[in-house]
Amino acid sequence: MKHLLTCCELPKCMLEYEDTLNDYDFVLYHQYLKDETYRNNYLNKRKTHPDRMMILDNSAYEFFVSGEKFIEEDFIRVIKELKPTYYIVPDVLMDYQKTFENFMRWIEIVPTISDSQPYFVPQGRTFDEFMDCAARMSSLIRFNNLPKNFCIPFHNDFFLDRNKLYSTKIKRLIFRRRELTKDEEYAYGRIVLMDKLTSLYPNYTFHMLGSHNPIEIKYYDIFDNIISFDSGYPVKLAISGVKLGEEKEKPNVIIDDFYGTNLSDSVKELIIYNVNKMRDLI
C-alpha cells in the first residue's frame, strides 16, 4: 500500500519537531515573509536536506482571512530564493475568474522558474465552476507542456452538496450510517470530488490543501495519484485543549493566532499526540 505524505504546520516553538512529525516541509509564504526565524529555518533546511520534499504554499487562505494584499513579484522572488520542490501557483478562494486570470499569467512565468515545479489550484464557488476551471487549466497545461500537478482546496462551499447528490460506497465505508457533522460533510464532499477528479485526470499528481476533518485521509489510499496532504487541524485542536477524535467541530483559528506563542509542555505533548494520531489514520 502506498504511503500518503503528511505535514502539520507547527508553531514556532516546535519547529525542531518537524522532521519527526512530518514527512515533508510545507512552507507558508506569509510567515516566510514576516518571520526571520521561520524564513531562516527553511532556507537552512533546503541547504542541509536538499532531497527532502518541500512545498511553498501561496498562503491564499491566510491572505483571504486577513484581507492583506498578495504581491506576486515578491512570491516569485521567494520561489527563486528558497527553491522548493513545489510551489503553489497563486489562486483566489472560490473565485473561478480571478484564479483563471492568475493561471493565464503563470503559464508564462512557470518556464522562467527552473528549480521548482508548480502546483495549480482549480477554484469555483459551485461544482460546475470548479470542474470547468480544472478542465480549462488541464487543456492549457497539456498544450504548454507544463507539469501535471493539481492542488485541491478544502473550504469550497459546494463540498457540502456532494453527499446529497451522490450515494456511493465511499460514504458507507467512512461514516457507517451515522449523522455527519458539518466538518465531516465537507471532508466527505472532497472525497467524492476526488473520486471524480482522479478518474478524469489519471496522469496528474494531487496534493490536498488543508482539511475540515482529517478522517478523509484514511481513504485517500484508494486514489493512486494523491501523494500528499497538509493540515493544521491536529495542532489547532491541541491549542484548544482537545484530543483528536473527541472534537465536536473544527476550531475557528488560523496558525497566525498561535504561531509565535510560547506553549506549555502539556500543550506541546497534546500537539504531538494529535499529529501522531492523525498519521495513524493512514
Report residues per predicted region.
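Eukaryote-skewed repeat-based solenoidal scaffolds used as protein-protein interaction platforms
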Residues: K69, E73-F229
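Serine/threonine-rich low-complexity intrinsically disordered regions
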Residues: P11, Y17, N22, D35, ...
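Short, charged, surface-exposed secondary-structure boundary motifs
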Residues: Y38-R39, V65-G67, F130-D132, L160-K164, ...
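Sequence-level detector for tyrosine residue identity
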Residues: Y17, Y24, Y29-Y32, Y38, ...
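Alpha/beta catalytic cores of nucleotide-metabolism and tRNA/nucleoside-modifying enzymes
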Residues: M1-E16, E73-I76, P111, S139, ...
